[in-house]
Amino acid sequence: MMVIRPVERSDVSALMQLASKTGGGLTSLPANEATLSVRIERAIKTWQGELPKSEQGYVFVLEDSETGTVAGICAIEVAVGLNDPWYNYRVGTLVHASKELNVYNALPTLFLSNDHTGSSELCTLFLDPKWRKEGNGYLLSKSRFMFMAAFRDKFNDKVVAEMRGVIDEHGYSPFWQSLGKRFFSMDFSRADFLCGTGQKAFIAELMPKHPIYTHFLSQEAQDVIGQVHPQTAPARAVLEKEGFRYRNYIDIFDGGPTLECDIDRVRAIRKSRLVEVAEGQPAQGDFPACLVANENYHHFRVVLVRTDPATERLILTAAQLDALKCHAGDRVRLVRLCAEEKTA
C-alpha cells in the first residue's frame, strides 16, 4: 500500500537516490547529502514547533508500506520570502507611443517582483519514474492539500507553486541562456545548484534590477516564457484542476510559470470533510478513488481508497486503518481524488 508520511532522518539516502533522477532543474531537491540532511532537520523542527514561521517547511515522502521503498517526495514551505527575498518576474506590458509620429508599441516586459512574499508554497514534487502509475502522482501532489485542510492555521491565505520550466536533457535552458547567463556569468546547472544548496545571496547581488523587454531575448527564450518542462505538464494540469491559475509570474532562472490560488478555494481543501471510520470489509462497487487522511499532526498519513465520497461512515480494512494509524471510531478527512467531470 502506498502511504504519505512525514520525512524522517533515515530517509536521506532514499532522497539522494530520488535527487539523482530529476535530470536537473528541480532546485529544491539537489543531489547533495548535506543539503538534504539540513532540509530534513528543518522539517522535523517545524513539526516540533521549534522554528519561526519564516523558516518553517514540511516535507513528506511516498512510501510502499510493504517494502519501505521511498517512491517520491513533496513539500510545503509555510511562508516564502520572509528571510531571503523570493524573486520572480512579472510578465507585464510597457507602452511606447507617439501621436506625432503615429507610433504605438505595446511591449511585453519582465519586471523583477517580490509579490508572493509571505505566501505558502507547494514545492519539491518528484515521483520516481518507476512509480508513475496507479494514481501515485495524484496522491503525492494532493496529499499536501489534506494536510493544509487539517491544519489550516499553519498556513497563509495564498498558496503558490513554481512549475519547472523548459530545460533539455543536457541541462540547457533557453531562457537562462538568453537572460540569466548574461548577468550571472555561469551555466544554468551551476546557478541551480547554488540556489538549491541555500547559497542565494548571489541572486540579489547580480539580478537585473530594471525592466527587461522580452523582444531583446532570443526567439527560443521568448517561446518558453510561462511554459513547463514536458515532464511537468501533468503536474500543472493537476493543479489547474484544483483551482490554480497562471497570473503572469515566471521563474527567474528557467522562465517556468508560477501558479497560484487562495488556499480556501483549492478544491480538495474546500470539499474535504471529516467522517467517522469503522473497521470491516469495504462495500464492493464502481467507486471513485478518494484521498483519506488522519488528523494526527505529528504522525500524519494519507492513502488512496476507492469509496463513496459522500459516505458519512467510512469502512476500512484493518490494513488500511493500520497504514493511517487510525482506530475504529476515529474521524478521518475524506475527499474525492479528482474533480468530477462536468457533463453537458
Swiss-Prot record:
Matches recorded under InterPro entries: Acyl_CoA_acyltransferase, Arg_succinylTrfase_AstA/AruG, Arginine_N-succinylTrfase
Enzyme superclass (EC): transferase
Annotated metabolic or biological route of this protein: Amino-acid degradation; L-arginine degradation via AST pathway; L-glutamate and succinate from L-arginine: step 1/5
EC number(s) given by UniProt: 2.3.1.109
Keywords recorded for this protein, A-Z: Acyltransferase, Arginine metabolism, Transferase
NCBIfam families (alphabetical): arg_catab_AOST (TIGR03243), arg_catab_AstA (TIGR03244), PRK10456.1 (NF007770)
Protein name per Swiss-Prot or TrEMBL: Arginine N-succinyltransferase
Annotated source species: Escherichia coli O6:H1 (strain CFT073 / ATCC 700928 / UPEC)
Lineage: Bacteria, Pseudomonadati, Pseudomonadota, Gammaproteobacteria, Enterobacterales
